[in-house]
Amino acid sequence: MGMRSAARMPKLTRRSRILIMIALGVIVLLLAGPRLIDAYVDWLWFGELGYRSVFTTMLATRIVVCLVAGVVVGGIVFGGLALAYRTRPVFVPDADNDPVARYRAVVLARLRLVGIGIPAAIGLLAGIVAQSYWARIQLFLHGGDFGVRDPQFGRDLGFYAFELPFYRLMLSYMLVSVFLAFVANLVAHYIFGGIRLSGRTGALSRSARVQLVSLVGVLVLLKAVAYWLDRYELLSHTRGGKPFTGAGYTDINAVLPAKLILMAIALICAAAVFSAIALRDLRIPAIGLVLLLLSSLIVGAGWPLIVEQISVKPNAAQKESEYISRSITATRQAYGLTSDVVTYRNYSGDSPATAQQVAADRATTSNIRLLDPTIVSPAFTQFQQGKNFYYFPDQLSIDRYLDRNGNLRDYVVAARELNPDRLIDNQRDWINRHTVYTHGNGFIASPANTVRGIANDPNQNGGYPEFLVNVVGANGTVVSDGPAPLDQPRIYFGPVISNTSADYAIVGRNGDDREYDYETNIDTKRYTYTGSGGVPLGGWLARSVFAAKFAERNFLFSNVIGSNSKILFNRDPAQRVEAVAPWLTTDSAVYPAIVNKRLVWIVDGYTTLDNYPYSELTSLSSATADSNEVAFNRLVPDKKVSYIRNSVKATVDAYDGTVTLYQQDEKDPVLKAWMQVFPGTVKPKSDIAPELAEHLRYPEDLFKVQRMLLAKYHVNDPVTFFSTSDFWDVPLDPNPTASSYQPPYYIVAKNIAKDDNSASYQLISAMNRFKRDYLAAYISASSDPATYGNLTVLTIPGQVNGPKLANNAITTDPAVSQDLGVIGRDNQNRIRWGNLLTLPVAQGGLLYVEPVYASPGASDAASSYPRLIRVAMMYNDKVGYGPTVRDALTGLFGPGAGATATGIAPTEAAVPPSPAANPPPPASGPQPPPVTAAPPVPVGAVTLSPAKVAALQEIQAAIGAARDAQKKGDFAAYGSALQRLDEAITKFNDAG
């Protein structure tokens, strides 16, 4: 019976081929065009910043890795196809209706497309995936030694940090490549007749057998290599149910030998597989593969399970003791918690204190922080916003400066940035948004330890921050009334101004000044940017490229762009640092500071690893998620680390966007490796100017990770560690509106690191006992240049109330609750509790301080900004409460205790502070109402009605009662007296 010829593929006409080529060209252009534009823009941007070498190094590495991986993987797959084709049978009998014959005809008709196209496509995909691992490859090429060896194999930790990840990557690619080559070879032999299936039987040509068996043998050999590398990865492995990270008793005594046994079995199986080439018997490799599978189940899984259940669990604490000690040592090393960094001291926490002892603790009592940076932002907006398009973030920052008397003080600080999203009406058109409203103006600082005036009621004047302002004044000169002199308060770069989808500004001289700057009583003053930052935009090529990038035709047609124009974009400080140092993880908190008369944003950068042997693997998002991060939706990306260093301090100039990287950790091997990859990008630590060092602070995210780990790894004894009985807990935020951990707080207080009474800027946190609300420890991280980075842990052995119990005691105190009930007026006014600070005072005592704010009405409107109305304290179960720190300290410790506390700043003629030099008033919202005052007593021959006389007597009686209650510290009576006074004044005004 004759064979039917296979159907031929229809040929395309010339017109069809042209249309297909055009369509493919359009697709390629759509896919590659935006990437080419982005690459060119990045080349310009990195060059403008002075970091073009970073861009070219990354680009070259990615291209080389993509090409090498693509050629290797594609070449291996091509080899599998080519061998199958070259060794195909000369004659393949075709049966009727054989589907393989049709496929064979299709492949033969498009042999070059199939033979080259499939490997090329696979190679391209492999290259695209591989180029994303450019950092791992660069670390392998430039990584060095740690100078520390692992306790099991004696290898330097640089092997685990830099080499092992690279070997794993290469092994994974080889396994995938050989497997794909096996599949390609198998399919090709089937199509070309090297493998024929007929019913329940089949035929296999010699070339097909040799090639397929060889590829399987290579796969088994690669599996043997994988077993060898698995041994090292055990040291960063976490077995379920263990309170520590790393290889435990079962891993070392069962899993580790099992890996060696499996490796030996894999080598034997590989030999058995290769033997099929000569013996022509596929049963031998089949038996070998089954043996390998059974061995992995029995030796690799079954035996360790038996050891765990029979040997380890009955005596787990003793069996795991050695390995717990390894984990304690490694975790402390990996997270910077070694004995040269962390100092432990016993601290009673409940020692009695006299008024004289408290007053002598001047560094603490004079700096008790009253302003909560998460609460006072509406007050900044009310008094310092000036225009609708200026904006302050919801959470402000804390920094320290020397006051006019040379004393160290902490300040709530904020940059008055431009928020493009708050532009209204015609301000939103393209020219105004991108060429007129281009920058913010001003640096605002408020002493954190005081407010202006006393507000006994949220409707009274007082209780608002004292504002120190650096701003462009009405005559165009800089008004420097802030905590430090500032030459240039204009802000072109910042986290607020960049918080839009198109955050670019077009600046530069092109005719008259165009940018909005400030207003006088007569007109609006304009400005032209003169900084060095910005990508030139004068040429038509640049205009075309940016028109395509931002999909905006005005780049091409607008006459506001001239030969001197520049474009400022990518204006977020943290993102600029991450771009020029892509190997860094940045802290979630970026803060402004005045350094050498320049306003800069300070960014903390971390180097991290996720495979440090025996070190605990920590989720950054979980460890850093305190109540502030949750409330302001500022959670860091989920990233797991087992090693972290605050290796880099970066500054971003708020005016011209200059990024400067400084080496902070001179011993970090990871940073040293990256400094070899990108030489010259990170300046040595010695280049940090003293003026900058005075504003560097211990980073929040690192501290939160460390306190989470100190909760476990302060324990030295492995048996105690295993029992978890001596662990600590990070306390929950006691504020009833919070739902996560209590955040750490920056404060100025007495020097815990030096154990003296000098003022020190530090980051502090209380720690609870494990699953209890009593204090276990107090952690302080020094930010002073001389002791920067030192952690001091005060361990508290007694039963001292933790933050939750302290907050409960304060809020349920009868005097406090009655007074705030009167102020709240049945929820007509909103009461808010500020941050609960824990402060060591006197000789072994702990003072809790919690400011109380109130705002008129129940809304969060800026016009209803919160005022400080009370200060609550607790010491040794006793509550102190009053309008000022001095009153609260006196109530706790007696007369004289508040002698060194900072007093309340006077109000300026009972008028709230005016907004910064001559900007227009806030767009909306009334000014705070004046304090309610008693009507003057009539004098002379004025006859009052009996009703007015009676009301006046009630007024005088209420004033006298209020004074007596204030002297006695009876704030429940004081609140009642204020209410009587309001009622009496109303009666007086209504009386005829």
From Swiss-Prot:
Which sequence ranges are marked TM in the entry? 17-39, 59-81, 113-135, 169-191, 212-229, 255-277, 284-306
Q: What are the GO cellular component annotations?
A: extracellular region; plasma membrane
Q: Using the chain's own numbering, where are the disulfide bonds?
A: none
Outline the segment boundaries, as ranges, of region: Disordered: 906-938
User: Superkingdom of the source?
Assistant: Bacteria
Q: Would the keyword Iron turn up in this protein's UniProt record?
A: no
The record's keywords, sorted A to Z, are: Cell membrane, Membrane, Transmembrane, Transmembrane helix
Q: What is its main location?
A: membrane
UniProt membrane topology term? Multi-pass membrane protein
The biased composition feature labelled Pro residues covers 912-938
Q: Where in the cell is it found?
A: Cell membrane
Query: Could you tell me which PANTHER family the record lists for this protein?
Result: UPF0182 PROTEIN SLL1060 (PTHR39344:SF1)
Family, according to the entry, reads as follows: Belongs to the UPF0182 family.
Q: What is this protein called?
A: UPF0182 protein Mb3215c
Species this chain originates from: Mycobacterium bovis (strain ATCC BAA-935 / AF2122/97)
